[in-house]
Structures are given as structure tokens and as C-alpha cells.
């Protein structure tokens, strides 16, 4: 569930989910 994932990430990192998603996309699958 995406909503649960967002809550988990925010709880774990304390960072905004949008930033995490952008960072994950940029570093993981988007670019190098």
C-alpha cells in the first residue's frame, strides 16, 4: 500500500516523502 509506505518512510527518515521519492527515482532508476 502506497499510503502505508509513505507513512513508514516519513516515520523512519523524518524527511518529506516527495523528497524521498525524487531522490530514490534519481539515484535508483533515473540517473547515475
UniProtKB/Swiss-Prot annotation:
Q: Please give the Gene Ontology molecular function terms for this protein.
A: calcium ion binding; phospholipase A2 activity; toxin activity
Task: Identify the species of origin.
Answer: Gloydius halys (Chinese water mocassin)
Gene Ontology annotations of biological process type: arachidonate secretion; lipid catabolic process; phospholipid metabolic process
What is the cofactor note? Binds 1 Ca(2+) ion.
Binding positions for Ca(2+)? Answer: 26, 28, 30
Functional description taken from the UniProt entry: Snake venom phospholipase A2 (PLA2) that inhibits neuromuscular transmission by blocking acetylcholine release from the nerve termini. PLA2 catalyzes the calcium-dependent hydrolysis of the 2-acyl groups in 3-sn-phosphoglycerides.
Give a Gene Ontology cellular component term annotated to this protein.
extracellular region
Family assignment from sequence similarity: Belongs to the phospholipase A2 family. Group II subfamily.
Gene3D superfamilies listed in its UniProt record: Phospholipase A2 domain
The record's tissue-specificity note reads: Expressed by the venom gland.
Write out the annotated subcellular location: Secreted
Q: What is the lineage of its organism?
A: Eukaryota, Metazoa, Chordata, Craniata, Vertebrata
Q: What name does UniProt use for this protein?
A: Basic phospholipase A2
Taxonomic superkingdom: Eukaryota
- The protein's predominant localisation is secreted
Q: Name one Pfam family in it.
A: Phospholip_A2_1
Keywords associated with the record: Calcium, Hydrolase, Lipid degradation, Lipid metabolism, Metal-binding, Neurotoxin, Presynaptic neurotoxin, Secreted, Toxin
The cofactors it requires, by name, are: Ca(2+)
The yes or no answer to whether the keyword Secreted is present is yes
Q: Which InterPro entries does the protein's record reference?
A: PLipase_A2, PLipase_A2_dom, PLipase_A2_dom_sf
Enzyme Commission identifier(s)? 3.1.1.4
Q: Which reaction does it catalyse?
A: a 1,2-diacyl-sn-glycero-3-phosphocholine + H2O = a 1-acyl-sn-glycero-3-phosphocholine + a fatty acid + H(+)
